[in-house]
């Protein structure tokens, strides 16, 4: 199977998101455990967890698009998963590392985008007639 340019880009993004989730997880476990409070470490870990979960979701959406390249709803879901993940996880990383509580107000935007993305993804899968 020949991957189109968009598929290659999103597969590379997925691989980089997974690599960075592993790196952030290790950084949190080893580099931040003596710096952050237990509560802030838990918040940081939540960002890592959701980055892992949504990286798998992004991979799934990308594979589905490779199988159904003309399904625009899949592409919308894929993009929302990526944007939602970046907003959600990065806001938690910065909130904890830089001690910027204001970023806590941004985190739910990322979470909401993730929820919308997976609802669209489910709809796209169920309504696919190709």
Where are these regions (language model features)?
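Polytopic transmembrane helical bundles with strong interfacial aromatic enrichment
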Residues: 1-130
């Amino acid at each position: 199977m020949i991957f189109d340019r968009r598929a290659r880009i999103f597969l590379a993004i997925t691989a980089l998101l997974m690599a960075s989730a592993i790196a952030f997880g290790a950084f949190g476990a080893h580099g931040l455990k003596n710096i952050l409070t237990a509560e802030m470490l838990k918040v940081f870990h939540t960002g890592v967890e959701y980055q892992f979960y949504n990286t798998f979701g992004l991979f799934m959406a990308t594979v589905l698009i490779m199988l159904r390249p003309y399904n625009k709803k899949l592409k919308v879901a894929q993009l929302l998963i990526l944007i939602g993940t970046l907003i959600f996880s990065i806001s938690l990383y910065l909130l904890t590392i830089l001690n910027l509580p204001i970023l806590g107000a941004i985190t739910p935007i990322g979470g909401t985008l993730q929820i919308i993305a997976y609802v669209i993804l489910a709809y796209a899968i169920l309504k696919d007639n190709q």
